[in-house]
Amino acid sequence: MTQAEREQENGKEKEKEREKEKEKEKEQRGIKRPIAPPVIPEPLQEQIQSNFIVVLHPGSKTLRIGRATDTLPATVPHVIARRHKQTCQTRYEDGWLVREGLNKPESNEQRQNGLKMVDQAIWSKKMSNGVRRTPVSAEQARSYNRLIRPAGLDTSSRMKWTNTAHHPEHLVGEEALYVNPTDCYNVHWPISRGQLNVHGGVGGSLTAVLADLEAIWSHVIQKQLEIPLKDLKYYRCILLVPDIYNRHHIKELVNMLLLNMGFSAIVVHQESVCATFGSGLSSACVVDVGDQKTSLCCVEDGVSHRNSRLCLAYGGADVTRCFFWLLQRAGFPYRECQLSNRVDCILLQQLKETFCHLDQDISGLQDHEFRTRFPESPALLYQVRLGDEKLQAPMALFYPTTFGIVGQKMTSLQHRSQGDPEDPHDEHYLLGTQSKQDQSSKASAERKSLPKPPGFEGELSSQGGDPSERGGGAHGQDVELGHSQNDCLMGGAEMEEPPSALLSRKTAMTQFEGKALGLDKAILHSIDCCASDETKRKMYSSILVVGGGLLFHRAQEFLQHRILNKMPPSFRRVVESVEVITRPKDMDPRLISWKGGAVLACLDTTQEMWIHQREWQRFGVRMLRERAAFVW
């Protein structure tokens, strides 16, 4: 290479260096770019250890929490006792078995009418030997029970009131349950009927309820899971929420878990879908009978069908209270028992679980015994004679007028979202920005593709946005089916329903709206709201019962018999078998949903659902719309 060529090469290299320096200067100074909305980053694909994932399933009565690798979760009463801030403060306690609507003038008459229907149903169903049951009147048992007096046991009660001598600010779980009523503590149950227990009384504000939840969950994580709170930054959380959820409450819970408690990431998923994961079923009509509410939902391939979601405002606690009423009619020998007494409520719960059943073959009067063990009281042994009361109480789930609840909304659906100022691209935004041309073209296409009954034109044109889950959004409140809701019952996540199905569903809804719907009828309604006959057949052949509210002997056979008798005749011919599953894989039905959350933690697809703490700080509730496995 000549000298001239070398100089030419050097000159080119120097020019390249000068260009690079200019580019660096531009980067340092900054270049004007068009303003664009921030793009939510794609979730990071990383290997996650399951033992660093905490699965959290909060219930009205019980909290279940544990690592995803745990065989069983920690199970704790979901209650907190808070010390009074002032010495003269009036004591307050949230009711457990007591609820509004019980002491109305019509309550007793309604209970009696419900009991007549229960007795008629008991008599109409023959026993396995083909003979009808002989009814047993409460008077027969009462004449014996009135003469019973308790016998003292040699051993004194080992139960003690929780020691509050060191004046703890709050007590959680079992300790809160056994706080002496004379101590200066308020007792709160932060979740009621599956929703945050927000009310107008003491400790009923949203801030107070969230503070109670944070205190309970933090305590259990430290004491039961043995995880220091400062180490939560290394842990992730899976939160199970009700199928009919309140968007605002879910947002506040995620905020609390990520920002207050300090989890590094979170996944939010629905209880019904997790129940199918936990039971190993791909599709099922999930019936979750809890302590204070019963929720129903049809799940297909990990998707909860919105139209099939239903929440009934009764559960196991109502059965316990009904059993107590029946015991009193039969002359219950423990005459000091009170529903307002926490310790008596625990006893009644135990008696229900021990004595009640759904076995038609058990008939006639039978003698039983039970013990009372109360703090600072001697242990006593009682004899009691019972007849049909043991069967009548759980049958109230199928005839809920027996609960005697008057003036309360007993059935609720999920309806449209009220919008969130932090989520500008919500349903209201989509509806508002959709052009009239798009709406009219969509409506005309639907009119051409679907046969319409007279007078239905134009109704679907009011629909906008994604049709997959615009069926109604949001707060877990009761639905008033007026004209504004006429278009909010569109199809589930799988396909749109034809107008005839919409009309039939609206007609059906108006028939039972506001009434207490029996469990069997609610199951039939939930399945009937599925869009296709094929899906309905799947659901009839896989009815999954979870939760602790239906843990009675022969409950599976009893429910199966009622579904078979009441299902539409057209399906009776095509459905091969109606299968009710109460103990999938021989597991405790109360743990199925939690177990499903643990399974969810191990799935590869879960990688796409994690909401990280930094993302939540930056984008807020929009992350739920982007990452939630269900349509937010």
Swiss-Prot record:
Family, per entry: Belongs to the actin family. ARP8 subfamily.
Keyword presence, Oxidoreductase: no
Subunit (UniProt): Component of the chromatin remodeling INO80 complex; specifically part of a complex module associated with the DBINO domain of INO80. Exists as monomers and dimers, but the dimer is most probably the biologically relevant form required for stable interactions with histones that exploits the twofold symmetry of the nucleosome core.
Molecular function per GO: ATP binding
Amino-acid positions noted as binding ATP in the UniProt annotation, renumbered to this chain: D288, V289, G290, D291
Species, as recorded: Salmo salar (Atlantic salmon)
Composition-biased stretches (Basic and acidic residues): 1-30
Primary subcellular site in the record, as a coarse category: nucleus
Residue ranges with Low complexity bias: 434-443
Cleavable signal peptide: none
GO cellular component: chromosome; nucleus
Disordered, as annotated region: 1-43, 410-429, 434-494
Keyword Cell inner membrane: no
Protein name (record): Actin-related protein 8
InterPro entries for this protein: Actin (IPR004000), ATPase_NBD (IPR043129)
Biological process annotations from GO: cell division; DNA recombination; DNA repair
Function: Plays an important role in the functional organization of mitotic chromosomes. Exhibits low basal ATPase activity, and unable to polymerize. Proposed core component of the chromatin remodeling INO80 complex which is involved in transcriptional regulation, DNA replication and probably DNA repair. Required for the recruitment of INO80 (and probably the INO80 complex) to sites of DNA damage Strongly prefer nucleosomes and H3-H4 tetramers over H2A-H2B dimers, suggesting it may act as a nucleosome recognition module within the complex.
Cellular localisation: Nucleus; Chromosome
Assigned keywords, A-Z: ATP-binding, Cell cycle, Cell division, Chromosome, DNA damage, DNA recombination, DNA repair, Mitosis, Nucleotide-binding, Nucleus, Transcription, Transcription regulation
